[in-house]
């Protein structure tokens, strides 16, 4: 009998993961009910290029394409989301400035990242030499990645 319960539970779980996602009242989806979000997060990308350049960004996850954005100096782009119960939420961005570009992960399931982001808000700032993550624990920007030369 125990094997049958485990088998039925496995079938229900796999159906929940593959079910069609339907938007319900207030923006809640069926997936949110079946696989609840663990915590709410915000990711922010800031153009801190002191040369006055426009920063091009294109951010996405497996499920969401956040579109192409051109950020002027000191402008920011933010999005909110809930990490899923499977801890598989993952966002990355392509960024481009006049003489450099990069593909960079901006959110993934990692306790060190969570600590640096203060368990709620990851702030990435593009500067002339690279991309920095605001470390809320130490109160300073930390260089995460340097620009690759070219387009």
From Swiss-Prot:
Its main location: secreted. Keywords: Secreted, Self-incompatibility, Signal. Restricted to floral tissues. Transmembrane segments: none annotated. It is found in: Secreted. Residues 1-18 form the signal peptide. Coiled coil: none annotated. The keyword Nucleus does not apply. GO terms for cellular component: extracellular region. GO terms for biological process: pollen-pistil interaction; rejection of self pollen. Belongs to the plant self-incompatibility (S1) protein family. PANTHER family: PLANT SELF-INCOMPATIBILITY PROTEIN S1 FAMILY-RELATED, PTHR31232. This is S-protein homolog 1. It comes from Arabidopsis thaliana (Mouse-ear cress). The lineage of its organism: Eukaryota, Viridiplantae, Streptophyta, Embryophyta, Tracheophyta. The gene is SPH1.
